[in-house]
Amino acid sequence: MDQVHHRALDALQSFIALTDSSSATSPRYIASIITNATSSPHTYVFAELLERPAVQALRSPDTPAEFQSYLTLLEIFAWGTWQDYQQTPNLPPLSEEQARKLRLLTLLSLASTIKPLTYEALMTSLSLSAPSELESLVTTAIYSSLITGRLSPATNPPTVNVTSVAPLRDVKPSSLPTMISTLTAWEARCGSVISDIETEIAKIRADSAQRRQKEHARAVAIEKTLEKWNAEGGEQLQGGNPGQGQGQGQGGLGKNAGWKPRDLSTAMFERGFFGGGSNKREFDDDGYFDGGSSDFDQHGSGMDIDEGAGARASGARHSKRFLGKKS
């Protein structure tokens, strides 16, 4: 599409050079340049030609009325439509080439403003009497790279599906304030969206930092709890039977010697983390003492039965019944 725009600008340069020549002093001569420029098959933009002093001189009150209308005609080719030409009186008649050019330019404008582009709407806007005329015009626009699209005559209603339009229409000066207002409103909406996104990002980061802080505190608490359990287990084993634990050192077990804590859930159960006020029946089938000692119980498996609800609360010690093989 950009190549089409460049080609259109290049095609206009020869007509601009003619308006800048020393011979471009006659209104009739300028009107002839406008006619040739709007009839050329490769010219689609005309704003640069409109800005030339010789062309703007046609607006002078001293210019004959028959030539003043050529300036209006050039403005319609720059940013107007076929309907604008039909509704403006006293304009020069169009040649076949000019009529096809103006219809093509009008198709570009309609493709950017009307959705969907039905056959009926296009034929009315372009003053075409048959669908075949519209299809021929659209085909010319597609092969000239003015639009990208396809014809859909079998749909109900028949439509022209346009996906892209070449930037070949000039901007009308009076429409600039509206464009600026539209862009300003769009900028404000973008700023609001960006502000909302930044606020959400800050919230996510704060939540993430808070979660990390909680996880760190939880990890520290667990580590301290495990250290406390290790210390308590070692202290309990220091008062063990000197006759046991041969090879562990004379006079009993040293601190933490031979103490192998089981998994965390078992340790937490033993320490009363899951509630110690209920009846407890614990059975060690592996023959190890419940106190954490690694010495094997020579008198059988250790089963301690703490009978009676509230036995822990009363503080009364119940004797353990050791069940196993008699020696």
UniProtKB/Swiss-Prot annotation:
Residue span of region Disordered: 233-260, 276-327
Gly residues bias spans: 236-255
Subcellular location: Cytoplasm; Nucleus
Main location: cytoplasm
GO biological process: cleistothecium development
UniProt KW keywords: Cytoplasm, Nucleus, Signalosome
Transmembrane annotation, as ranges: none
Pfam families: CSN7_HB_subdom, PCI
Chain intervals with Basic residues compositional bias: 315-327
Protein name stated in the entry: COP9 signalosome complex subunit 7
Keyword Nucleus appears in the UniProt entry: yes
Quaternary assembly: Component of the COP9 signalosome (CSN) complex.
Keyword Nucleus in annotation: yes
Family statement drawn from the similarity comment of this UniProt entry: Belongs to the CSN7/EIF3M family. CSN7 subfamily.
